[in-house]
Amino acid sequence: RWRIDRCWHPYHAALDLAVEAAARRHGGVIHLNCHSMPAVAGACATEHPGLPHPDFVIGDRDGTTAAPHVTALVIDVLRTRGHSVALNHPYKGVEIVRRHGDPARHRHSLQLEINRKLYMDERTREMHAGSAALQQTLRELVQALLHADPCR
């Protein structure tokens, strides 16, 4: 209960305020919820243990949390950089994405799962040279999203 009161509630309250402020200021918002995932699905992580993951999994909860043009933009940027990308499989998006995604109100929320093999040795947890390339990819993605029109 302590962690919920001290961490969960304040975090979600701050995120709610940030999303609302961005939507008021810009007429819409594009929220990207980033996570890391192992190169291969673990026994308890998904319904598909042993499944090799692509470089990225985009989750829009089957199109309910972001407009198609926003999801397509993210996929296009990542594939243009040579990455493998899956949509909603095996991760559709978590509660934060559901809570903040409402495309009819120009509020787009996507979960972005990033394969750890892109930036670290999973066995040692040491970063490797791929982390610089990943940083550049993420910079390009953020720039593309900054120029996207959430109200389209």
Locate each region found by the language model:
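Catalytic cores of processing enzymes, dominated by hydrolases/peptidases
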Residues: 10-120
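Aromatic/hydrophobic pocket-lining residues that form the small-molecule binding cavity
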Residues: 8-11, 15, 134, 138
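Surface-exposed cleft-lining segments at the edges of enzyme active sites
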Residues: 1-8
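His/Asp/Glu-rich mid-to-C-terminal helical/loop segments that flank catalytic regions of hydrolases
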Residues: 122-152
